[in-house]
Amino acid sequence: MSRYDPSMIEPKWQKAWAEAGTFTASMEGNKPKYYVLEMFPYPSGRIHIGHVRNYTMGDVIARHKKAMGHNVLHPMGFDAFGLAAENAAMDRGIHPKDWTYKNMDDMRDQMRPLGFSIDWSRDLATCDPDYYGQQQALFIDMMEAGLIDRKNAVVNWDPVDMTVLANEQVEDGKGWRSGAEVERKELTQWFFKISDYSDELLEALDGLDDWPAKVKLMQANWIGKSRGLQFAFGLVEPVGGHDRVDVYTTRPDTLLGASFVGISPDHAIAKQLESESEDIAAFCAECRKGGTTAAEVETAEKLGFDTGLKVRHPFDTAAQLPVYIANFILMDYGTGAIFGCPAHDERDLDFARKYDLPVVSTYVPIDDEGHVLPEDGGAAYVPPKPDPVRYIRGFAGEEIQSGNDAIDAAVTFCEAEGVGQGVTKFRLRDWGLSRQRYWGCPIPVVHCDACGVVPEKKENLPIELPYDVTFDVPGNPLDRHPTWRNTPCPSCGAPALRETDTMDTFVDSSWYFARFTAPHADTPTSKAEVEYWMNVDQYIGGIEHAILHLLYSRFFARAMHITGHLPRKAIEPFDALFTQGMVTHAIYKTTDAKNRPVYHYPETVDLRDGGGYLDDGTAVEIIPSAKMSKSKNNVVDPIEIIKQYGADTARWFVLSDSPPERDVEWTASGAEAAYKHLGRVWALCDRISEAARSVSEEAQPAAGEHDTALLREMHKTIRDVTNGVDSFGFNAAIAKLYAFTNTLQKSKASHKAQREAVMTLAQLMAPMTPHLSEDIWAHQGGDGLIADAPWPVANEAMLVESTVTLPIQINGKRRSEVTVAKDASKEEVEKRALADDAVVRALDGAAPKKLIVVPGRIVNVVI
């Protein structure tokens, strides 16, 4: 009998698929289409087990849909622009382009041995001029459609690297790379006007039925729709032409609890005061250090500066509130000013205690009968808005009412009194896309002294990045290139300058799904192809992309519809979304002489006696099931796994060990067990194949009850595996395949029935273990490639149970089982049980002392 050898099997079938063009997407025939897409990778140079799990899930879906008769589009590419390539250029003296293209070649070489059903003819990289040239064309179309704006914005500026930093790149107020104190700087930036679509993007979430509820909630919170009151506190003494402070609040019902007014360091009044006071200027400068996200501002220590200004309360002009400049107020939300109600906001309470400001309650908790309950004096009282409370300083609505009702009543009252107006605001801001970096898509505009800002002519696209740049000094190499910036104005022909900012890399990934439908077209999309293939039927990726990437893609799809590049049906581009769990692995740690942690690769640790040891006998601390991380060395190289066990083993294990939405822990023992199981499947199928060849058709016994039992289990397995794959229950489907393999191994059915079962087993395993399945199919004489074979269909008649399998106990211990007709008589069951091999061996010619049949339940043999 031959041995299961993935190193021989897998390359053979990969070559066969490639030569046959098996996975080249086609629009031919009267078939339904199916577009499955996994989020494309950044070309770091190495794939990891997380990639393997993600792409294997998509591959199972793609292969299954192909077998179900669909034209399948399953492409792959690279999200190839980004800061890492520039870092490589600075750290290692490698050009970003060379570094990126080598990494992409390496990753393709690592992905191909995994046997994914990818249409490699559609391979694209966002750093290819063919791709970003079409992105530039899209940008121009969006400019002309009024979807792009150019305006000033406050950014994180690294004065050493001379670049804008994302909020995530600011660490403790310093640039993550240079270590320089980050400045908040106002720069002219390009923006996509995504905020114009806030309400539409929010409302449309309700129609995304096949998206995880968690993702939709995260997007809804990010869009952040709120209903509130916008009004003004009048300044007691005007300053610099300002006589009021405009405030937006979502809790106007707490106005009578106000004890201070806070303004952002970037508020116009704060800027006026900066010019008049060195102390205020120093405080505002300190506030501008660090990140600009709401999350970072919320977690920072709350600091304020009493400006000495006072405002009048709109309901009690005799009452005056102090005005503070506060570091926790962002200029780009609301009006850049708030009133503080410490009794009902934890942040305001911290601030009030720090600066000895009054704390005045406007409402108190009550029980179900409306009786006042004691408050927790140590914390602000912030009940959920739907909960009823008793207002002790209310001014609108009922004395007992919910927060929601009180807010509505307060807005109505204030509008009637001429104190502001009710407004709806959104947290979502316009998408700033300007980056002062080289390795990105050039923004296709020209700055002309006579004409102003002018879009480049489309016939001049792509505007390609120059290769001859240097990274030996900080800043954007495009700014200092001797010739690249210089260009004639597209409008008047006079000497002009190119825009040197490049696009945020999120732009590149916000439309790639549409480009995959026609990756070689000379326009961003091709009408026939995009009409046929869109929408993406199944999108697969990590929950970490729930907000920015997915939200930006939803906006871009709308923009591309407006500019004529997508049909109306595609404004929500992803019909179904699945967010997979991570692959984890234990961490193996020791400490060095200075008690610093030292992390060890899994292959260097010997696991024995319940612990882990290095080659020299040093015991290691085992930290279980942590996210794989290069810094912790708890990573597993897929290429090494393929060399040791084969691609099918890696695929089988990442699918079988856990539900796909949960994390899966990679263990050597789990991989070994998966490999052994596939070896057993191979051996079983080889044995059945040999047995069938050794017996002539005429010599085979007629079909009997063993055949019926086996084929019945086969059809049940077809049903269960189909349901499992359709519902992303891959681990449940694999559990059914394990069970059916065991059934087949024990079966006494005819060779013909066993061969049919083997062929079906191969088809059901093909999406998960395509190479092994192809080999089994070929050995059993299957027609063509199993990758082209139709999916088996369960025979409904065979799913109706006409038999029952009863366990046989001998002296109280289960030893065997017997399958009989559901309506079999007691005598028939006894006869079949006494003929069972295990019972015959146990009796050894003697009669049983007692034989007990519990109909439909069990057979007990007492010896």
Swiss-Prot record:
Subcellular location per UniProt equals: Cytoplasm
User: Which Gene Ontology terms cover its molecular function?
Assistant: aminoacyl-tRNA deacylase activity; ATP binding; leucine-tRNA ligase activity
Q: Name the residue ranges of motif: 'KMSKS' region.
A: 627-631
State any GO CC term: cytosol
Q: Carries keyword Ligase?
A: yes
Q: Which Pfam families match?
A: Anticodon_1, tRNA-synt_1, tRNA-synt_1_2, tRNA-synt_1g
Q: What class of enzyme is it?
A: ligase
Chain location of the short sequence motif 'HIGH' region per the record: 41-51
Q: Which UniProt keywords apply?
A: Aminoacyl-tRNA synthetase, ATP-binding, Cytoplasm, Ligase, Nucleotide-binding, Protein biosynthesis
Q: Which reaction does it catalyse?
A: tRNA(Leu) + L-leucine + ATP = L-leucyl-tRNA(Leu) + AMP + diphosphate
The answer to whether UniProt assigns keyword Protein biosynthesis to this entry is: yes
Q: Name one GO biological process term.
A: leucyl-tRNA aminoacylation
Residues annotated to bind ATP: K630
Q: What is its EC number?
A: 6.1.1.4
Chief location of this protein within or outside the cell? cytoplasm
Query: What family is this protein classified in?
Result: Belongs to the class-I aminoacyl-tRNA synthetase family.
Entry-linked PANTHER family:
LEUCINE--TRNA LIGASE, MITOCHONDRIAL (PTHR43740:SF2), LEUCYL-TRNA SYNTHETASE (PTHR43740)
The name of this protein is: Leucine--tRNA ligase
Q: Which organism is it from?
A: Jannaschia sp. (strain CCS1)
